[in-house]
Design a protein with these regions (language model features):
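Metallocarboxypeptidase
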Residues: 48-49, 60, 80, 92, ...
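Edge beta-strands of extracellular beta-sandwich domains
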Residues: 533-542
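Active-site/substrate-binding loop(s) of hydrolase catalytic cores
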Residues: 73-76, 88-92, 96-292
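Boundary at the C-terminal end of the N-terminal hydrophobic targeting segment
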Residues: 20-22
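Intrinsically disordered, low-complexity Pro/Gly/Ser/Thr-rich segments with frequent PxxP/GP/PP motifs
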Residues: 490-520
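Short, aromatic- and glycine-rich surface loops/edge beta-strands on solvent-exposed regions
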Residues: 521-530
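Short amphipathic, basic-aromatic surface patches that mediate peripheral association
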Residues: 459-473
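Bacterial N-terminal signal peptides
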Residues: 7-18
Length: 542
């Protein structure tokens, strides 16, 4: 009786302590590191963890490999978070994916079938600002950089003028300003349109002072380089935060080098403020025909559309965001320069709140207006009411500090993250099931007489995705399918090539091949590539 009592007691204690210590907030760098190390310890046969770089602030850029068997020659997907360090949700989503995929990979049914390369956060210097005493949206790493090119570094950072630990906005009453109060919600401001007889009444800028006296505010804060502007495709040279040159940063160079050396990756999924899964890339003849292409190739459009269709089936699309080109961005690099299928999503968007009789639901600053409606409905307080302050740079003007909190519009309450992660894990699971997969089908062995044997078969791509992008076949960076026939030394291949390459097989496509062989003994046939897997066949001719 006492034994049963203690069993029940300890069971209840375990339950309540588990509830007490359940994950309730976004994880910072150290908590993420601990979680990754725990995964490696829990699944030593399927998970390996390595640091590919050290950031300027001394943080490791972690790379988690999940899979078993021949890791280098099994089709793989890369999952990347944190290329924009202000996108906190994406980092947590990538980490949650790693945790679920590691558990799935340890099962016998998944053994040796697929590999995942997860980079949860490639810009930890920037994302740590979310967890700092002073919170503001930061996309740049910790590299000492003269962002305003005045010969000084970090001399004009943000200033917390109302001492609330947040950097929001300042509005300054000024007849030369170009901003007016929003007609539907005077907490927001919109740009005045002189053609509609609107006259500006406010200046609007981020919270802070002109610390260096150059007439600009907060133009040279701590850091750095925005890694999502630092990749090689359409690098925005000389733009704020883009870096001195493409892949100038330790983090971006390490990621690009590792991916270029990892030939078995067929697709890349990244979490960024962009979304080409709800708004898929479209083929444009003129863009694809340029010497330096600026649009996807025609042969790749169908894949982007079909994967988008899958995403829309799995992930609810209420008020889903869209895509706009980010020069120097990681998702763009992953297709145009790495030549893999590149999918990116922000993972969450504010649901549309319909307010009866509202004039400007799709008008200026409608996203912020919709966010305020939604946050009020959900009981989420992420707006600082405007409060008048004394500002040394505007001694004779009315200056107020307030606005939507940093990160609020892209970082949902943590209570929503599990459900968001679950639908995206479901999507990734279904996407990985579409991977290219090679097999030999319709094998025929015929006696051709005179000690000759004909072997005929089809090499079939059982997967839904092609064995490579069309762009990959053009750049010749994605490895083609290598076909090789070998036989005993006493045998001779009379017709049919002993070794050749196939550029690409579409999903469900087959290619017939045939050999005429003289003599008896063993023959072996292999066909495949690291990103599509390998098919093998052996036969003994008697």
């Amino acid at each position: 009786m006492n034994y049963r009592f203690f069993v029940i007691l300890f069971g209840l204690m375990g339950f309540f302590f588990g509830q007490l210590f359940a994950q309730e907030t976004y994880r910072n760098y150290q908590e993420m590191t601990n979680a990754l190390q725990e995964l490696e310890n829990e699944f030593p046969n399927t998970v390996s963890l390595q640091s590919i770089a050290t950031s300027p602030n001394g943080h490791n850029v972690w790379h988690l490999t999940i899979g078993t068997g021949d890791i280098e020659n099994t089709p793989a997907m890369a999952i990347v978070g944190g290329s924009d360090g202000a996108h906190i949700l994406g980092i947590e989503m990538a980490l949650k994916m790693a945790e679920t995929l590691a558990e799935q990979a340890s099962s016998e049914t998944m053994s040796g079938q697929h590999v995942f390369h997860v980079f949860p956060n490639i810009n930890p210097d920037a994302s740590e600002q979310y967890f700092s005493q002073l919170r503001y949206e930061r996309s740049v790493n910790g590299k000492n950089t003269d962002l305003d090119r005045d010969g000084m570094i970090g001399e004009d950072p943000y200033d917390d003028l109302n001492s609330d630990g947040l950097i929001t906005m300042m509005r300054i009453e000024d007849p030369t300003g170009s901003w007016i109060l929003h007609p539907d919600d005077n907490r927001l401001l919109i740009e005045a349109n002189p053609l509609k007889s609107q006259r500006g009444a406010y200046l609007l800028m981020t919270e802070g002072q002109d610390n260096d006296g150059d007439g600009h505010f907060n133009e040279d804060p701590d850091g750095g380089v925005n890694l999502n502007k630092n990749f090689t495709y359409q690098h925005p040279s000389f733009e704020y935060g883009s870096g001195e040159f493409p892949v100038s940063e330790t983090e971006t160079r390490a990621l690009a080098d590792l991916l270029f050396d990892t030939f078995n990756i067929y697709a890349v999924l990244s979490f960024t403020p962009n979304n080409n899964l709800s708004d898929p890339w479209q083929y444009s003849r003129s863009d694809a025909a340029k010497r330096v292409i600026t649009g996807i190739l025609e042969g790749d459009e169908g894949v982007f559309q079909s994967v988008s269709d899958l995403y829309k089936e799995v992930v609810p699309q209420d008020n889903a965001s869209g895509y706009s080109l980010q020069p120097g961005g990681f998702p763009e690099w992953a297709y145009f320069h790495y030549a893999r299928y590149s999918f990116t999503t922000d993972g969450w968007w504010v649901p549309k709140v319909k307010t009866e009789g509202e004039e400007n639901s799709n008008g200026p600053d409608s996203d912020k207006l919709n966010y305020l409606r939604w946050s009020e409905r959900e009981g989420i307080n992420t707006f600082t009411d405007w409060e008048q302050i004394d500002h040394p740079d505007f001694p004779d003007k009315v200056v107020e500090v307030g606005g939507v909190h940093p990160f609020a519009m892209t970082t949902p309450p943590y209570s929503m993250v599990d459900s968001l992660a679950n639908v995206h894990i479901d999507f990734v699971t279904q996407l990985s099931a579409m991977r290219p997969e090679l097999a030999f089908e319709n094998i025929q062995i015929e006696d051709a007489g005179r000690n000759l044997t004909r072997i005929t078969l089809d090499l079939h791509n059982k997967g839904s995705l092609p064995t490579s992008t069309e762009l990959g076949t053009r750049t010749q960076w994605v490895r083609p399918i290598n076909v090789e026939m070998t036989s005993d030394s006493s045998m001779q291949i009379v017709s049919g090539r002993p070794a050749f390459q196939i550029d690409r097989l579409m999903g469900g496509e087959s290619q017939e091949m045939s050999w005429l062989i003289s003599g008896s003994g063993s023959v072996s046939l292999s066909a495949g590539s690291s990103s599509a897997g390998f098919a093998t066949y052996e036969h003994t001719i008697r």
